[in-house]
Design a protein with these regions (language model features):
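Polytopic transmembrane helical bundles with strong interfacial aromatic enrichment
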Residues: 1-171
């Protein structure tokens, strides 16, 4: 079972790296693309490629997460499956998935979708790294919602500064 856990961990880390890196680059490319007020075909291509990387990361996270679920269930590590941290990670993964669908359908403003994506991927990473986290599910999600709002505000400020500097984009 050690080998199975190692393989799952490697894939889970790979999915996280692709998701966090992709979300970061997507936001950078998006902000760079809108500074002149028009997203040209090359910028669109970069964004599509980056979103594909994020989707691959999400796919890997979901399937390695299902693998962890099965492994923990079969090896009797039920206590972890009942922890607040586990359910917070599952909730944030679901938010990443739903946000991706809403962005794809153009049913969510990009300022909000980008903030949710960026925050969610980093938050999921921190939850995976932070071994001794002692918070309830509600506390974790409260911090998460606050982080989404802060990231949305910071991204808005960055966009505002860029728009003032280049005088072509809209806020």
């Amino acid at each position: 079972m050690v080998e199975a856990k190692l393989i799952l961990t490697l894939f889970h880390i790979l999915g996280t790296v692709l998701g966090v890196g992709g979300a970061t680059m997507a936001e950078i490319f998006f902000l760079k693309a809108i500074r002149d007020g028009v997203i040209d075909p090359i910028e669109t291509s970069f964004l599509r490629t980056t979103y594909s990387v994020i989707r691959i990361g999400l796919f890997i996270i979901i399937f390695s997460g299902i693998g962890y679920l099965l492994l923990y269930r079969l090896t009797g590590v039920d206590w972890y499956l009942l922890s607040d941290k586990y359910w917070a990670k599952m909730s944030i993964t679901l938010i990443i998935l739903l946000n991706a669908v809403l962005i794809q359908m153009r049913s969510i403003p990009m300022w909000l979708g980008g903030a949710i994506s960026l925050t969610s991927w980093y938050f999921a990473m921190f939850l995976g790294i932070w071994r001794g986290l002692d918070m309830t599910f509600s506390e974790i999600l409260g911090v998460y919602v606050a982080a989404v709002l802060i990231v949305a505000y910071v991204l808005h400020l960055i966009k505002k500064i860029m728009c003032e500097r280049y005088k072509k984009c809209k806020i």
